[in-house]
Swiss-Prot record:
Component of the conserved oligomeric Golgi complex which is composed of eight different subunits and is required for normal Golgi morphology and localization. Its main location: Golgi. The keyword Transport applies. This is Conserved oligomeric Golgi complex subunit 3. Keywords: Golgi apparatus, Membrane, Protein transport, Transport. Transmembrane segments: none annotated. It comes from Aedes aegypti. GO terms for cellular component: cis-Golgi network; Golgi membrane; Golgi transport complex. InterPro entries: COG3_C, COG3_N, COG_su3.
Length: 899
């Protein structure tokens, strides 16, 4: 099998070789195609071979022919009739035949030899021809090399010539390019000198570009010959061109200005919103804007090339704005003057209309400027400030003469809110100059407000002289309450009459009844408010202070407001205190104190919404040490020039330096402090009004006991204690009958005066939580006075019979009495008797006569986070009450939380 496979593969290879050999000599697409020269050479060789082989034939063919000839000879011999009779004949014939055969046999070789010889000669000739051809080829090769060398050298020389030509062309082009910057000066200058040449011509831009390029070239190449001279020429050309542009723009602006300032201007006033005025003052300039904008655009695009363009643009800005100032100044001044006449007496309307007019003028001028120019200019802001200064010069005399704070506050609001916040915020670029002038006006208004506010605070608050009606308390409150009750009754009667018309059985009647009930409850809740809560019932200085602060809050800066608010609140507190003192003189101290408490609460409540710190830092110098140091210096005169550490002068300089003291003044704390003090006074006066006899007796008894103890200090210890215990009992004013009468008098005061006190508190305060907070320490002081009296009697040898005669009520009995004796049965959210106390003489016996403090402490949460505990003195009894409860503001908000 392997042999068969091998044979197959060999046969396949042979076939492949044969096919490839056949493909060598294919006429179409041979494997080794010959060139035309090669084919011609082969054909020539084939022809020469064909000619050489044609005379002779192949030796084998000749031998065959020879054999044929021999056969022919034998045949001819047979046919010739020759007779061989003898051996001699045969031998002769044979020899002849043999000779012929030999001859014929040698002829073949001779012929072949001759052919070979001929071929040798031909080969020699061919070799000679080949040698000749080789010589010719060698000669041709040498000649080709020679020609190639010559051609290469010629080509290299041509390339060198071309390079030299290119280099020379480049040098010539560079020379022409450089000479271009020098050769155009005269032609440009002649064209600029041509009177018919205009700036509006299209070639003017090309001339400007050429001048800029030439100047830049001279600047970059200062070492070139005559570069400085040609730079001067081109600068002269540039000056001529800029002068032409300046004259061109100036003529356009001057013509537009002359047309506006013509006779038709007097017929058209510059009124706000006038279309004719806008067309007159802006139409001519807007029509000229495209021609000027083309020139200014070229200038603005070349600002970085030369200083002349910057100077030219600044001159054009100045020319444009000067023409606009000539047109607008008198017009704006006349328009504002007309507005001042139109709004004479109404300063707010004048400020609003004049500022609105200037806003439109500034926006129009800004828009017109950018129709002529692309970039802004500081001169535009200065020009706009000049126009707005007319507004400032017109309005400032009115502002500095305004005395009314509300008018000044309204003007301040107009300038700050309407102008700065609304207009300037949304158009900051066009209204930049207007904003500066308005800010100056605002500062003037604020300064005027501060000055007038100080005068107002001094004249109308601090030095306010109340009329009889202002101090008619509580008559005013009672009258307003009666009016409110009458209005409430009328409202209820009308509601009852309306509800009686509708049938009570229908669904509609039930709805009407529910509505009437809700209205009745609402009317009752409204009627429960005190007339003192009405804005018109506030004391005038309180109302004026709050109105003044509300006006100033949004008008002036925070630092100025803090200073003025500190002064205003101090003056208001002093004014309210003076009014309360006058009410106390005319009526009672309770009325004066309740009046002051109510208005201080109003003041504290109304200043709470102001989101500003009412704290003001005051800096002062303390010279107290200077006096001491000077005195020591006089005592140490001998040590003035001492060289040691005891130099008196040095000590004076060190110790006598004034100290800088900083003090924080908080208006809110001043109000709280004054409110706390007034509440303490009210609690003290109310307590003395109800249990004054008991408090006076306790003070007298304690003084008597102290005097007895001082006089009996020389006695023995036991006897001294016995005499001290009997000293009060033996005194005439401390007899049980006298003490009993004092107690009865105090109880009568409680029964007769407590209702009036609660009535006054309800009338003035009109807040049950506030009334409850104020009444609680009074209640505790009353109970504490009876408890203290009981302790005093127990510790000073009063017998049970004496105590029976005295009949001092216990704390529970006084609590029940206070709860039963009130105006409406409840004060505050719960009855006054809701606070439970269990204090009696027996319960105090285990305390060794120590003073018992009623459990009345409460905790109140404040926004400020302060929980300071203060002492409110009422008689001789000290009761702890938080400062927040004394200020009672958080009680009004219902944030009281029992501890």
């Amino acid at each position: 099998m392997d042999d068969v496979a091998t044979m197959k593969s060999e046969n396949a290879n042979l076939r492949k070789i044969q096919s490839r050999l056949l493909q060598w000599e294919q006429k179409d697409n041979p494997l080794a195609p010959l060139s035309s020269a090669q084919n011609e050479f082969i054909n020539r060789l084939a022809d020469s071979l064909t000619g050489a082989t044609s005379p002779g034939a192949n030796p084998l063919m000749e031998s065959q022919e020879l054999s044929l000839e021999c056969k022919t000879t034998l045949v001819d011999f047979k046919n010739s009739g020759s007779v061989i009779d003898s051996t001699q004949d045969f031998l002769s014939w044979y020899n002849s035949i043999d000779s012929e055969i030999l001859e014929h046999y040698d002829d073949v070789y001779l012929d072949y030899y001759g052919q070979l010889k001929q071929r040798s000669v031909e080969c020699d000739k061919l070799l000679e021809e080949i040698d000749v051809s080789l010589e010719s080829l060698q000669k041709l090769t040498n000649e080709y090399k020679f020609v190639s060398e010559k051609t290469s050298s010629l080509h290299q020389a041509s390339e060198n010539l071309l390079q030299d030509q290119t280099k020379l062309n480049e040098i010539g082009e560079e020379i022409r390019r450089r000479l271009k910057y020098f050769s155009q000066a005269e032609s440009i200058y002649q064209r600029l000198q041509n009177p018919t040449f205009s700036v509006s011509n299209d070639t003017f831009v090309e001339i400007l570009n050429t001048i800029d390029e030439c100047l830049e070239y001279m600047r970059v190449n200062p070492g070139f010959s005559e570069a400085f001279a040609y730079g001067v020429k081109y600068r002269n050309c540039l000056s001529k061109a800029t002068q032409m542009m300046r004259n061109y723009v100036s003529n356009i602006l001057t013509n537009a200005t002359a047309q506006i300032l013509g006779p038709q201007r007097s017929e058209t006033g510059m009124e706000q919103g006038s279309e004719a005025a806008f067309a007159l003052y802006y139409g001519k300039f807007q029509a000229s804007a495209p021609r000027v904008k083309r020139i200014t655009g070229m200038i603005e695009g070349r600002l970085d090339r030369s200083v002349e363009y910057e100077q030219l643009l600044a001159a054009l800005h100045q020319q444009f704005l000067a023409n606009r100032a000539t047109i607008m100044s008198s017009g704006v001044e006349q328009a504002i003057r007309d507005l001042s006449k139109k709004h004479k007496g109404d300063h707010c309307a004048l400020v609003r209309s004049a500022c609105a007019f200037m806003v439109h003028v500034c926006q129009d001028e800004h828009r017109l400027f950018f129709q002529f120019f692309t970039n802004s200019s500081p001169q535009l802001t200065a020009y706009m400030e000049g126009l707005c200064t007319i507004l400032y010069d017109t309005l400032r005399p009115f502002i500095i003469r305004i005395d009314h704070l509300e008018t000044l506050a309204e003007i301040c609001s107009i300038l700050r809110v309407e102008m700065l916040d609304e207009h300037v915020t949304y158009n900051p670029e066009s209204l930049e100059a207007f904003a500066k002038i308005v800010y100056q006006l605002l500062q003037d208004v604020q300064e005027r407000i501060g000055f007038r506010a100080q005068n107002y605070l001094e004249s109308d608050i601090l030095n306010y002289r109340p009329s009889a009606g202002d101090l008619a308390y509580p008559e005013k409150l009672e009258m307003m309450e009666s009016i409110a009750l009458s209005l409430q009754e009328n409202y209820l009667r009308r509601a009852d009459s309306r509800s009686s018309i509708v049938s009570m059985t229908s669904l509609a009647s039930q709805e009407v009844e529910s509505i009437n009930q809700q209205a009745e409850q609402a009317s009752k809740s409204r009627a429960s408010n005190s007339p003192a809560d009405l804005h018109g019932m506030w004391y005038p200085t309180v109302r004026r202070t709050l109105v003044c602060l509300s006006r100033l809050y949004r008008c002036i800066d925070r630092a100025i407001f803090q200073s003025l608010s500190q002064q205003a609140l101090a003056y208001c507190i002093q004014s309210v205190s003076n009014a309360a003192a006058q009410i106390s003189q005319k009526k009672t101290s309770i009325d004066g104190e309740l009046f002051e408490i109510k208005h201080l609460l109003i003041l504290r409540e109304q200043i709470a919404p102001f989101r500003v710190d009412f704290t003001v830092k005051e800096t002062s110098l303390d010279f107290s040490k200077v006096k001491t140091a000077a005195f020591e210096l006089l005592q140490k005169r001998k040590q003035l020039f001492a060289l040691g550490s005891n130099n008196a002068l040095l000590e004076f300089l060190l110790d006598g330096t004034p100290q800088v003291k900083e003090q924080l003044l908080d208006s809110r704390k001043d109000v709280d402090r004054q409110l706390k003090m007034v509440c303490e006074m009210f609690i003290k006066d109310a307590t003395r009004q109800l249990v004054g006899p008991i408090l006076n007796f306790i003070d007298t008894a304690q003084n008597h006991v102290k005097q007895s103890a001082a006089s009996g200090s020389s006695q023995p210890g036991a006897k001294q204690q016995q005499q001290q215990g009997l000293a009060l009992r033996m005194a005439a004013f401390a007899a049980p009958q006298q003490i009993s009468s004092i107690i009865q008098e105090s109880i009568r005061n409680i029964k007769t005066k407590l209702g009036a006190l609660q009535r006054s508190m309800q009338l003035y305060l009109a807040n049950k939580d506030t009334e409850f907070i104020l009444f609680r320490p009074i209640r505790n002081n009353i109970i504490g006075s009876f408890v203290k009296l009981e302790q005093l009697l127990t510790t000073n040898s009063y017998s049970k019979d004496d105590l029976t005669v005295v009949s001092c009520p216990s704390a529970e009995q006084i609590s029940v009495l206070l709860s039963s004796v009130n105006l409406s049965g409840t004060v505050g959210a719960e009855p006054f008797g809701g606070i439970q106390r269990k204090i009696s003489a027996s319960s105090m016996g285990g305390n060794g006569g120590a003073s018992v403090k009623p459990p009345i402490e409460k905790k109140v949460s404040f926004d400020s986070g302060a929980n300071t505990v203060v002492q409110i003195e009422a008689g001789s009894e000290a009761v702890e009450v938080s400062a927040e409860e004394a200020s009672v503001e958080e009680a009004l908000e219902g944030k009281i939380e029992a501890e």
